[in-house]
Structure formats: structure tokens, C-alpha cells
Amino acid sequence: MENSLKIKDIPKNERPKEKLLSYGADTLNNSELLAIILRTGTKGENVLQLSNRLLSEFQGLDGILEASLDDITSIKGIKEGKASQILALAELFRRFRTFKSADRDIKIMSPNDIAMLINGEMSLLKQEILKVIFLNTKNIVIGTKDVFKGSLNTSIVHPREIFKEAVNKSSTKIIICHNHPSGDPTPSKEDINITLRIKECGEIMGIQLLDHIIIGKNGFISLKEKGFI
């Protein structure tokens, strides 16, 4: 039966590891790459079949990278060992996207530049986070910081925390960004109120709020482009 087919029964040049070594990682599909990470299958299922099932259950690689420990271990045959391998892969991906951008000066010229900087990291988050990007007079990024976690509202978002960090970094401009775990980046009334409050405080302190970017699953919205800044 196909379900009992073992990796060793697959022609050697079609096995993920051998294929990678012979032809390069870029020749492998997502299922084959995931199979190399997982290394082994489960009872009655080889590692390629397991990888295909995971990709199907989570509707693609994005879904796997967004999954929590409970999400992954709820899948039949997946224990904490394999779940930890997947979670480690997801964390490496997030860190790569963050640290890659730190290797060079980044100049912000448009909302697209902001989205390119943070989208890979923030679009995968399941908890709402407010991130601040600090810039110098030339719009070069000089730092970022997550300042709030959880549902955002004007009662918990304190501008002093944002501007204290901006002053410490000698930042003359800031951009605030947060994600909507629902996937819909449409700004809420609270999002707009928070934006206006931070903008007003910035004007008093001489630190300009350039934009507020809201990240969704498949896109983003710039409150500056929408006319709120």
C-alpha cells in the first residue's frame, strides 16, 4: 500500500535529502524541504506524506509558520518533538527577516518601504503588537522596539513610553506599526484615535509621526495615505 511506503523505498534521486545534495535546495518544493526538517514520518506514514498532510491541514507554509504548539500537536501523529522542530523553523524565519534588514542602512521613502521592513515578521503574529520604528533626520532607521502587546486602546497606549525611547535614541521621526491578527488591516476607531494622540504629542515634543501602518495577513494600510496624518 502507498500509505506504508517508506522513504528508503523511494528512488534515491527522488528522496528530499539526496535531491538537495545533488541539485540544490532551490529545486525542492515546500513538502520536500519540510520533510528534511522533520526527518522522520509517523506510524504508517513516511515523512513526505506527513509533510504533505501538514501543508494541507494548515493551508500552506504560511499557516504552519503561524501555528502554535497546541495547533501543531493537535494534528494526528505529531508530538512535542516534531512540533518543536516546526516552531524553531518559524522562529528562525522571523529572526532572519528582522536581522537581515539590520545589515544595512534602511531609508524610509514610502509606506511600501515600511511594509517591506516589518511585514514578514508582523503578519505572522497571533497577538496584537505595537512596534515603533525610530528614524533620524534623513529618514534612516536607527532602531525599532515593541512597546505594547495585546488589544490596543487609548487607555493602555501611553505616548510617554514611545517618546521616551525616541529621545533616548535621538530620533527626530517615528513610525508606529501594529498588526491585526484577524488578517483585516482596516483601521478601527481606536486605531485612528491612538494615531491622532501620538501625532499631537509628537508635535509638542518636536518628534514627527510619519505614518501608522496596520499589517494584515495579505496586505497593509497606511493611515497617512488614508489622510489621518
Curated annotation (Swiss-Prot):
Residues 107-229 form the MPN domain. Pfam families: RadC (PF04002), UPF0758_N (PF20582). Zn(2+) binds at H178, H180, D191. Gene3D superfamilies: 5' to 3' exonuclease, C-terminal subdomain (1.10.150.20), Cytidine Deaminase, domain 2 (3.40.140.10). One of its GO terms (biological process) is proteolysis. Keywords: Hydrolase, Metal-binding, Metalloprotease, Protease, Zinc. A motif (JAMM motif) lies at residues 178-191. InterPro entries: MPN, RadC_JAB, RuvA_2-like, UPF0758, UPF0758_CS, UPF0758_N. CDD domains: MPN_DUF2466. SUPFAM superfamilies: JAB1/MPN domain (SSF102712), RuvA domain 2-like (SSF47781). GO terms for molecular function: metal ion binding; metallopeptidase activity. PANTHER family: DNA REPAIR PROTEIN RADC (PTHR30471), UPF0758 PROTEIN YEES-RELATED (PTHR30471:SF3). Belongs to the UPF0758 family. NCBIfam families: PRK00024.1, radc. This is UPF0758 protein CLH_0547. It comes from Clostridium botulinum (strain Alaska E43 / Type E3). The lineage of its organism: Bacteria, Bacillati, Bacillota, Clostridia, Eubacteriales.
